[in-house]
Swiss-Prot record:
MF term (GO), any: ATP binding
Pathway per the UniProt entry: Purine metabolism; AMP biosynthesis via salvage pathway; AMP from ADP: step 1/1
Domain notes: Consists of three domains, a large central CORE domain and two small peripheral domains, NMPbind and LID, which undergo movements during catalysis. The LID domain closes over the site of phosphoryl transfer upon ATP binding. Assembling and dissambling the active center during each catalytic cycle provides an effective means to prevent ATP hydrolysis. Some bacteria have evolved a zinc-coordinating structure that stabilizes the LID domain.
Subcellular location: Cytoplasm
UniProt subunit comment: Monomer.
Positions bound to ATP: 10-15, 127, 199
Protein name listed in UniProt: Adenylate kinase
Protein purpose: Catalyzes the reversible transfer of the terminal phosphate group between ATP and AMP. Plays an important role in cellular energy homeostasis and in adenine nucleotide metabolism.
GO CC annotation: cytoplasm
Amino acid sequence: MNLILLGPPGAGKGTQAKLLIKKYRIPQISTGDILRAAVKDMTPMGGKAKSFMDAGALVPDEVVVGIIQERLNLADCSNGFILDGFPRTVAQADALAKVLSGLGRSIDHVISIVVDNEELLERVTGRRTCRNCGKGFHVSFDPPKSSGICDECSGELYQRDDDREDTMRKRLEVYWQQTSPLVEYYKNKSLLRSVEGVGSMEEIQQKIVSILQG
């Protein structure tokens, strides 16, 4: 099963990917993680990516796609994979389709986790992180016993820059600008299924599994 997970920041893609990994025993491929690994291991494409990164430039699509191809060739992807964070644009989706075609494979499902912006803002801006041990809390959904203090180590809790409202609004704006055409792209290929990302982790997981097994 070859699966793409789409969804805005804070929608719970990472959580759902971890649950799907356990259930289907296929790897999650996060572009950020494999890019860093390819650079560290100095794979052919990792070496190319490093030259762009060292120059402070964005790594071009063809290099990112090449790194994904290197990853898909590894044995643990033989029964499928979950792509998280890629593709983000129609051009990337086209490039991915060509790579998969060359491997004799194709995407089976594209799951879009849908959550409205105000819900996402509440989820993300309420996050707090311990400066000392890194444990996460949420002011509404998982508050610490004492305000601003970590339950585990009594460290100070703070709000990461990425979790601030102005930053999150910008991230959402960029996401929707990039991804709206991608949603249409996969809808036109009859691959896209949308799942409401509201409810417990288990409830959302069950909705996704129902689609995958349907």
